[in-house]
């Protein structure tokens, strides 16, 4: 199985890289690709939906992965410890709004979907269980907006009922759907939206164990 990993920020991918893998094997359109291990390629694409979609499509077109996994940090709508690991059940895009022409909010008309579930959730949960790492499962809201404790955050929570909010995941999910590639995601909580946590201060703590969990998860998922 060939696996592709999509990260947004250098800080998210940093702990995945070693002296042997730190040099990109190629860079296309500003997206750097790294050979993490045999049959595992990672890319760092930049923050936001367009960057995430571009990185995911390049990854798929260049390396033809069987599975794409998006990993990174996210804000949480619940008050949970920083660094809590979340296995995503699926994604929505909170900033897609064509209600003016009669569509339900969040509808991506190209694929006629609001909700983008991740692939093989029972197998993913079994793999995560086998790592022994405590984790949550939940839905994730994606949009080109850094979430804070504002009326919009409350609207997202009330409308889509997600556990997390971030800026890339659903874009990757949509690209995978259109390419017929399986998609999964693992997130680490960097801040709690209604608790006024400092994202910049907490991000290193959120990223600290993320890639240890990602690699343990993939090892379990790909066991024969």
Residue ranges and their predicted role:
Residues 55, 59, 122-124, 207-217:
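Short, well-ordered amphipathic alpha-helical segments that serve as non-catalytic structural scaffolds
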Residues 1-63:
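N-terminal short beta-loop-beta anion/metal-coordinating cradle
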């Amino acid at each position: 199985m060939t696996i592709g990993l999509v990260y947004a920020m250098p800080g998210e991918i940093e702990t995945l890289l070693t002296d042997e893998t730190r040099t990109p094997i190629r860079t296309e359109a500003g997206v750097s690709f790294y050979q993490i291990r045999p049959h595992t390629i990672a890319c760092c694409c930049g923050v936001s939906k367009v960057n995430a979609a571009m990185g995911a499509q390049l990854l798929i077109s260049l390396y033809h992965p069987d599975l794409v996994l998006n990993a990174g940090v996210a804000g949480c709508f619940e008050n949970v410890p920083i660094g809590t690991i979340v296995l995503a059940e699926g994604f929505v895009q909170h900033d897609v709004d064509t209600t003016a022409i009669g569509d339900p909010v969040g509808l991506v008309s190209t694929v006629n979907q609001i909700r983008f579930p991740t692939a093989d959730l029972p197998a993913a949960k079994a793999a995560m269980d086998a790592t022994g790492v405590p984790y949550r499962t939940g839905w994730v809201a994606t949009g080109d907006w850094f979430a804070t404790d504002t009326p919009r955050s409350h609207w997202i929570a009330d409308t889509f009922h997600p556990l997390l909010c971030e800026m890339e995941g659903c874009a990757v999910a949509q690209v995978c759907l259109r390419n017929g590639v399986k998609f999964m995601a693992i997130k680490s909580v960097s801040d709690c939206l209604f608790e006024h946590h400092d994202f910049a201060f907490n991000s290193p703590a959120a990223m600290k164990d993320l890639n240890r969990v990602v690699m343990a998860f993939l090892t379990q998922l790909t066991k024969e």
